[in-house]
Amino acid sequence: MSELADSGPSGASAPSQLRAVTLEDLGLLLAGGLASPEPLSLEELSERYESSHPTSTASVPEQDTAKHWNQLEQWVVELQAEVACLREHKQRCERATRSLLRELLQVRARVQLQGSELRQLQQEARPAAQAPEKEAPEFSGLQNQMQALDKRLVEVREALTRLRRRQVQQEAERRGAEQEAGLRLAKLTDLLQQEEQGREVACGALQKNQEDSSRRVDLEVARMQAQVTKLGEEVSLRFLKREAKLCGFLQKSFLALEKRMKASESSRLKLEGSLRGELESRWEKLRGLMEERLRALQGQHEESHLLEQCQGLDAAVAQLTKFVQQNQASLNRVLLAEEKAWDAKGRLEESRAGELAAYVQENLEAAQLAGELARQEMHGELVLLREKSRALEASVAQLAGQLKELSGHLPALSSRLDLQEQMLGLRLSEAKTEWEGAERKSLEDLARWRKEVTEHLRGVREKVDGLPQQIESVSDKCLLHKSDSDLRISAEGKAREFKVGALRQELATLLSSVQLLKEDNPGRKIAEMQGKLATFQNQIMKLENCVQANKTIQNLRFNTEARLRTQEMATLWESVLRLWSEEGPRTPLGSWKALPSLVRPRVFIKDMAPGKVVPMNCWGVYQAVRWLRWKASLIKLRALRRPGGVLEKPHSQEQVQQLTPSLFIQK
């Protein structure tokens, strides 16, 4: 009791650090403490505590877990001290019960002695009735015997009062111990409830952080996708702009070339008119003798000159075709590089590149056709205008210079396009590497999270699989305790009934002897003796009523235990279903096997006694053992119904009666 009183304030100093204690936790702790006299180690306590709380240990920081385990060690030490005190109290109660039994045996022996003395008095009173002359000395002997009987009755009364005081003292000690244990368990319940709330808050914060991180990753991925799409649109717009600029530049160059060709044609026409007039004048002057000579000389000269001009024009046309082919090859390279770079971007860029290639090819074909037409026209004009080649040489030289300028501009444009293509390729490679790094990081985080979740679920599954073995061990211990307590209660009840019957018989014999004495020798002392015997009988009746009241109180307690057990089973089933509805999608399929083990009967039930200060967790041994017997019988029946089950002996009538649910209501 002193250890309980000392450990009470230490347990009450931290009422806001633990969560609500569950019935399985207290059952495992106290059952282990009752079964093993050695102190529990930290590893066993951690395993038992983690088995009862598998989902809340992952969210507590390391410092909080260290403090929590230190507090758990202190509380377990206090609980072991309380269990030791309860064992000592149990031993004291057993010793007091043995002493009461010895005193009752002594009282019985004394009553037997008194009965034997009364019988001796009766035997002595009979010859006294036959011999009235010896009445006076025998009456004095009878008075002495009555005084001795009074003294013995006083001793019996004092022994009964001592027994009553001891019972009251033991009852008070038991109630005090129960109240202290109830207070300690209530405080521990409050502390554990507060810790459970803290852990739930921590779990919520952790889940919120995980959701925020996943949301941030999604936002980052969306932003990267938007940047990539925006970059692709910008690149496509730049290519379109440059394509439009190139087309405009080519169109302008072709228009300028066409204007120059028209100007050269107009100048040629003017020169042709002037030369025609000059030739007509000369033809008129030299129409005579020099006509044939001039024609021959002019024909030779014109043929040679025209051949040179045709060769120059052929070289210019070949250079122009070569330039056009180089331009086409460079454009084809650009298109091929663009097609390779944008192959992953979709068919839209490919279609655009194809259209651009077709457009450039059409422009090149148009340019080639225009060149061929121009060459044909130039050949036709050369056939018709052999004399006007000098003016055309200047125009051809001018065109060659312009073509050289164009050929000088085209490499610069191609180099710029190559540089821009390289820059775009570098940017795309950087964006691709960043995207791959972010994706790799997210995949690594996801794999790490999955690995942690699988490890945590594996640990939870192992702990949940170990729960049925622990519950079965506790059930076996409860069965042993119940069998011992039933044997003791039955033996004590039979002994008390036998003693009460013996006392009643002795009182009946004593009353009959007193009645005989009253009939033989009426007197004041006989009346006093009868009154004392009546008071003694009243005291015995009160003792019997007290025993009956204790029996009714025990029956009421057992009934309340049964009712509260059914309520606790219903609430436990609701909580298990709610927990499964919340945690079911994240729990593996293997944990379904551990679900029936969670719905097993609880060893502790709440006893809302009106005489107690606070609600108290009491050990319902009687109903627990009945439930365990019922469960064992049901398990045997289920094993018999299975196809591979081993056949056993049929249940006796006593076991069948134990299976009836009315036993939970009776006692």
From Swiss-Prot:
Pfam families, A to Z: CCDC154
| Major localization listed first in the record, in broad terms | other
Disulfide bridge map: none
Q: Which GO terms describe its cellular component?
A: early endosome
Compartment(s) of residence: Early endosome
Q: Name one GO biological process term.
A: bone mineralization involved in bone maturation
Keywords, ordered alphabetically: Coiled coil, Endosome
The cross-references to InterPro entries, in alphabetical order and at most eight, read:
CCDC154
Origin, by domain of life?
A: Eukaryota
Q: Which residues form a coiled coil?
A: 76-182, 215-302, 384-410, 457-521
Q: Any other comment in the entry?
A: Overexpression suppresses cell proliferation by inducing G2/M arrest.
Protein name as catalogued: Coiled-coil domain-containing protein 154
As recorded in Swiss-Prot or TrEMBL, the protein's gene is named CCDC154
